[in-house]
Amino acid sequence: MPYLQPPRPHPHPHPTSRLSRASPPSPFPFFPAGTSRSGRLQPVPVSGHSASRVSKGKFAVAAVTLDDYLPMRSTEVKNRTSTDGIKSLRLITAVKTPYLPDGRFDLEAYDSLINTQINGGAEGVIVGGTTGEGHLMSWDEHIMLIGHTVNCFGANIKVIGNTGSNSTREAVHATEQGFAVGMHAALHVNPYYGKTSTEGLISHFKEVLPMGPTIIYNVPSRTSQDIPPPVIEALSSYSNMAGVKECVGHERVKCYTDKGISIWSGNDDECHDSRWKYGATGVISVASNLVPGLMHSLMFEGENAALNEKLLPLMKWLFCEPNPIGLNTALAQLGVVRPVFRLPYTPLPLEKRVEFVRIVEAIGRENFVGQKESRVLDDDDFVLISRY
């Protein structure tokens, strides 16, 4: 059985939401007297001669003039990236987030993964997406990882932060923070679980689109609600609307590309045909975590049915259980990340771990990330973390 780390006291015993549990730090910790972190007026205590003019228990309210230093808003961002600059990206990797044995981010391993993506030809990375387990992060962790990626690699690869949420309030706040720390674009899923109407979807996305280049993510298998074409068409006129990561299939891809809307396939096993037969711009890929060079060839070098066929067993293996279970298992067996899982994710069973090693041999170890030989890990090699 995998090693299950014993529980430790949770630092936030009464969380109510990801934002209330761990709000992302402001990039400007110091504000002028009389303003809150949001820039609103706050009562300021007065003393001495001035205090005599104020009745006991009362406070004077400080005035804020246009010359006062106010916190950065969403219109003032660290990196200005054109929407067209995002629309042109063909290979975007939904990058894995690796962990240390205590459940914290393994930034050394993460940096190595990003460098490998750059060297393999990826043009962008999704930080904290489904594959990167953003839903298992506090917003503090989430924004920190986006900022870290921008600061270390933003000059060489586009950083797209997954700042979407089923709460419009959280999506707005996280997206402001993401652009403030320098992300080039945002990825936004439609509100899940607490589903809304068509008008609600449009209103939700309209709240975040003014902040910067935006990719909308349609994945009904996870959200249990399809984003219908009328929603995307209603939003397509917005200058910050970069396009859609579409997981419904080829017909939907063609529906949008015929209208001039940029589309990235969200399905590795369909991305070749989506790109070359149905007009997709490219792919937002899971498999490129493992074989970035081959995925680059698949998106840049024209139709290649033979290469696509060669990669299909790997692509199907990756999704034999919900993503990112397969990817986490694969990267651990390649020796590029520690075999640490944040629960509720657990490694694939032994027979699937054996199958992966055979797939690596068939495709060629030299095409995969890392330098170590692929090996079958035992159950006891894995560490499962419940407090993180």
UniProtKB/Swiss-Prot annotation:
The keyword Transit peptide applies. The active site is at Y217 (proton donor/acceptor), K245 (schiff-base intermediate with substrate). Sensitive to lysine inhibition. This inhibition increase in an allosteric manner with increasing concentration of the inhibitor. It catalyses: L-aspartate 4-semialdehyde + pyruvate = (2S,4S)-4-hydroxy-2,3,4,5-tetrahydrodipicolinate + H2O + H(+). The keyword Transit peptide applies. It is an enzyme of class 4 (lyase). Residues 1-51 are annotated as: Disordered. Its EC number is 4.3.3.7. The record marks T130, Y193 as: Part of a proton relay during catalysis. It is found in: Plastid, Chloroplast. Residues 1-62 form a transit peptide. Signal peptide: none annotated. GO terms for biological process: diaminopimelate biosynthetic process; lysine biosynthetic process via diaminopimelate. Catalyzes the condensation of (S)-aspartate-beta-semialdehyde [(S)-ASA] and pyruvate to 4-hydroxy-tetrahydrodipicolinate (HTPA). Tetramer of modified subunits derived from two genes in different combinations. This is 4-hydroxy-tetrahydrodipicolinate synthase 1, chloroplastic.
